[in-house]
């Protein structure tokens, strides 16, 4: 186990690039080290921050507790049968690198999730999703360290209680389970998921008349994301800042009467998912800036650190967007990233 570092700068560990320090910081390179970490005098399960890629957090002030950076790596095949392969990835693996690894192995199901920032360990927490695929569609099980019993446990897909950008790990399991690895069920036979029009068009162009491959889909997703989303290494951001709101069919019908071109996605339960980026764009907020934080000029769903943004700049900008969208559409937006501490959340 690496030694604890004190007063550690967390700016490189959060993709929005907010300036903050950790009172204490330690890197976890092997899951077994968790048994030692929970016995450290600096450890308090109520205040510890389990940190992955830092792509889904907003550090609003210096972190008063212990920060554990998950750096455990490794990918291995567990089982293979009937066109299905179970593959385990450690929590510290970079998500996009893992997706590319699976595609290169001919394992299918992750390609639509290419270029999502963060680590494998974060994928079940947020139930990450893009272009018609969510993590829950491919996760077989999640291996965790249970802080209640200080033992390793395996949770099935059903145990994780996945929902849209939600999971057990954000609800009643928050603060109890530390994700150490994720097992994915991937297919050896490729069936493309091209329900989104811009993705279908991009794949058709790449495949040029031949049968498309998973690599074609992955490459197309990367091209689309790169054209719309800023690179966090160049311009700090946390990807999509707001969840796509889900409204009743009646509410959607009312909005459609006034906005017939409004994108909408009917859900199996009869509700309708709306495009948060479209709602923000209709309020003419692209490029709008408060302090050093701004709405990206090409993608309204992304807030960026344009000029050494402070935590307060980000909060004020997010609040302005929420109020403006609600005033026009009577639809409430909710932020995707986690505000730390949670008392700052809107």
Swiss-Prot record:
GO biological process assignments: cell division; cell wall organization; peptidoglycan biosynthetic process; regulation of cell shape
The UniProt entry lists the main location of this chain as cytoplasm
Q: In which pathway does it act?
A: Cell wall biogenesis; peptidoglycan biosynthesis
Q: Where are the transmembrane segments?
A: none
Location within or outside the cell: Cytoplasm
Look up the EC number in the record and give it: 1.3.1.98
Source organism superkingdom: Bacteria
Got a GO cellular component term for this one? Answer: cytosol
Which top EC class is named for this enzyme in its record?
oxidoreductase
One short Pfam name that applies is MurB_C
MF-aspect GO terms: FAD binding; UDP-N-acetylmuramate dehydrogenase activity
InterPro entries attached here?
FAD-bd_PCMH (IPR016166), FAD-bd_PCMH-like_sf (IPR036318), FAD-bd_PCMH_sub1 (IPR016167), FAD-bd_PCMH_sub2 (IPR016169), MurB (IPR003170), MurB_C (IPR011601), MurB_C_sf (IPR036635), Oxid_FAD_bind_N (IPR006094)
Which keywords annotate this record?
Cell cycle, Cell division, Cell shape, Cell wall biogenesis/degradation, Cytoplasm, FAD, Flavoprotein, NADP, Oxidoreductase, Peptidoglycan synthesis
Q: Which NCBIfam families match?
A: murB (TIGR00179), PRK00046.1 (NF000755), PRK13903.1 (NF010478)
Q: Which PANTHER family match?
A: UDP-N-ACETYLENOLPYRUVOYLGLUCOSAMINE REDUCTASE (PTHR21071:SF4)
The family annotation for this protein states: Belongs to the MurB family.
Could you tell me which HAMAP family the record lists for this protein? Answer: MurB
Protein's recorded name: UDP-N-acetylenolpyruvoylglucosamine reductase
